[in-house]
């Protein structure tokens, strides 16, 4: 400590001696130096304007005057006059030291710096005047160098060094003051000056014991009475998203929403905080859509994005609707190139972080506005699969087929034909009634096994009347084959029925055998047919649809045949016919007592006779004609009974509706024929009693049967052909 004090005293003594010796010389040197500075023109950038020297020395330079003021603010213990004298002395000393070599100047600078390093804070406090002298001397040396080198930047360096020294003195003299607090206040004031907050801005606001929360700024005039009770001067009314709260926040606790989104979004993972961010992002999207909307969009969409409705207890209802957007969301800030680039990058890597949600929402809103301008109401939506394809559940083919909906075009239906599918059960039994159908793909061939499905045609309605059918059957029985007219009327896709050619039966057994061979197959019910078609392993064979006619049709056939047997006109009688009629008259009673089978065989006529004379079986005009006609009626009635017995065993009925209808017809016909049978019996008794009646009565009986023949000829084509042949 003693050495340091001695050094300080030696320095002060040297300064005092220098002041006493060279006042006059220093004044002269300073005057010459001032003149040189004026001639060069560095008055503005130099150390300042110089004045004429007085008795105590030259006036202070402007830079040194400022130094004195700063020293006064830091060191309150020093007097202004004392420091002024010191500064003046230093200025004189600086003028004197101008003529010294540069080595001496460097030595003085080192001494000054050494003193500054070695002096402790308490020493500085006790020797404030001496420390100021040292600091000023250091500044003096710098000024001398600057004056010698003619550099205008020297004063700025001088001021910087002095400020550094002042800071050191500040820290040493008043250690209880905190520099950090002063800097923090300056930063807050600086941030508040930079942030420009306006109404309806989206911001981040801070409340004690809560993270930075997204909110929206409102004007103080929009506050409710409840909110005005918490009003603070110089604060802003902020409504928070999500929880519908509000607060009066100072400018230092408010930050812009967009600039600080990536930083603030990481604060918390609470559901309330995430919901608040989502609501804020929805408002961002609405503002961008409104800012880029054109007049071509629909009114409904425009009203949806035009207004923001705020529900908050701190905002009045009349101020809760905000129309429009903000300046940042307008079309001026829209950059199409950035949008296209972002979409391409997102397509390459679809994943994004939560901190990029603001950018994603903004770009999506811009793309949506562009799509609306193109005429679409919304963006296209695509279904995305999460996870790998290998981890996806496998769907069985059955489930996949059940999920699909099969749609088939309806086939055009025909008005008079219905397509059915039949199955061939036994080829051998059906061979007599079916004709093999050629396969268009495999050529004409006979199939040994089972057929595939084939569509056959079943007429909905009867295409022929019963009278026509009876006439055809009658001709086929005489000719031994089917008529060609029937085969010509069959449709192209329907199979022809194969009829077995045989001789004319001579007995009822042959007739029965003919009926069995004509249709040997058993009827197939629709229910069994449907079950067989639905069976998995069966192959289906085609079968021709048979004509539907029942028992009533058979009975009616015989009745019409009986009426059609009488000719429309009477043939001339010959001798042979009259003899046969006389014989038959005598044996009328015996014929009546014959069995029915013999009566039918007696009635049958040879084929040659039938073809030559179709009406040979009719009754001729003889004197004993009445008994002959009565025997013919007995024969017909016997044939009717025989057919009625054999009819239930036939396999001709396929349609239940037609069967019921034919049964009704058969019951009616049966009653009619029973009446005719009783009438025939009465006629037989009369014929036995009145066998001597004249031929006029017989002719009268023939004339009574003639109208029925006319009716038969009107309903049957075969009868007309017979009349034309005669």
From Swiss-Prot:
Chief localization: nucleus
Keywords in alphabetical order: Flowering, Nucleus, Transcription, Transcription regulation
Sequence motif: Nuclear localization signal 2, positions: 495-502
Biased composition (Basic residues): 494-512
PROSITE patterns associated with the record: PWWP
Motif (Nuclear localization signal 1): 460-467
InterPro entries with a match to the protein in the record: PWWP_dom, PWWP_domain_containing_PDP
Subcellular location: Nucleus
GO CC entries: ESC/E(Z) complex
Gene3D superfamilies, per database record: 2.30.30.140
Family matches, as SUPFAM superfamilies: Tudor/PWWP/MBT
The PWWP domain, residue ranges: 199-260
Positions of region (Disordered): 1-26, 392-441, 472-545, 568-726
Disruption phenotype: Delayed flowering associated with reduced H3K27me3 level on FLC. The triple mutant pdp1 pdp2 pdp3 has increased levels of FLC, MAF4 and MAF5 expression, but decreased expression of FT.
Sequence ranges of Polar residues compositional bias: 12-26, 426-435, 606-634
Pfam families reported in the protein's UniProt record: PWWP (PF00855)
Basic and acidic residues bias spans: 1-10, 658-688
Gene Ontology biological process terms, A to Z: epigenetic regulation of gene expression; flower development; regulation of DNA-templated transcription; regulation of photoperiodism, flowering
Function, as annotated: Together with PDP1, PDP3 and PDP6, interacts with MSI4/FVE and MSI5 to suppress FLC, MAF4 and MAF5 expression by regulating the function of the PRC2 complex and modulating H3K27me3 level, thereby promoting flowering.
The family this protein is said to belong to: Belongs to the PDP family.
Subunit structure of this chain's protein: Interacts with DEK3. Binds to MSI4/FVE and MSI5. Component of the PRC2 (polycomb repressive complex 2) complex which regulates histone methylation on histone H3K27.
Protein's name in the database: PWWP domain-containing protein 2
Gene label: PDP2
